[in-house]
A protein has these predicted regions:
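N-terminal hydrophobic or amphipathic segments with adjacent small-residue motifs
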Residues: 5, 44, 55, 64, ...
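Exported/periplasmic cell-wall-interacting domains
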Residues: 24-26, 30, 82, 88-162
């Protein structure tokens, strides 16, 4: 080892050190969590293995702006995300449980126009009746999104199906 260090410090070529190959096994946890969103039931479910940890009603995308279907993963998680509106003609930033996206947000898909996420809402009625009213995001009651948010990590798989 001193010869290797001396060679590196002197800028000369040092002999290679032979070592036994090490095989690293990257294993997924035996009971990996995943989220399943059933658009027909308008229900989101958290599973660990085959065990259901929670199921909650949701509001989904309007037929003109549907929630995308497919396999996704949680891209990022935000507490007290900022919602920006220009409805009054001026830029206003809203945040917290009474903002249109509540106080928890989890992105799962990006396209050229923005991001799709699972988030809270200022309008619990739409979630309670499981409405199709959003621009493609998934709305949950604020108390429910907090439970789901705390139970999953960035990278958690999300399946959205009909």
């Amino acid at each position: 080892m001193p010869a290797l260090l001396a060679g590196l410090l002197a800028g000369s070529a040092a002999p290679c050190l032979a070592a036994e190959p090490v095989e690293l096994a990257l294993r997924k946890p035996a009971y990996e969590s995943r989220i399943v969103l059933d658009l027909s039931k308008r229900q989101i479910t958290l599973l660990r293995g085959e065990q259901q940890l929670g199921a909650w009603p949701v509001a989904i995308g309007d037929p003109k702006t549907p929630t995308p279907k497919g396999e996704f993963a949680i891209l990022n998680k935000r507490v007290n995300p900022i919602y920006v509106t220009h409805k009054s003609g001026q830029r206003r930033e809203l945040r917290g449980p009474s903002s249109p996206i509540g106080d928890r947000y989890m992105a799962f898909h990006r396209n050229g126009r923005g991001e799709f996420g699972i988030h809270g809402t200022a309008w619990p009625h739409w979630v309670q009746i499981r409405a199709a009213v959003s621009l493609g995001c998934v709305r949950m009651l604020n108390s429910h999104i907090r439970q789901l948010f705390d139970a999953v990590d960035v990278g958690t798989r999300l399946e959205i199906r009909s």
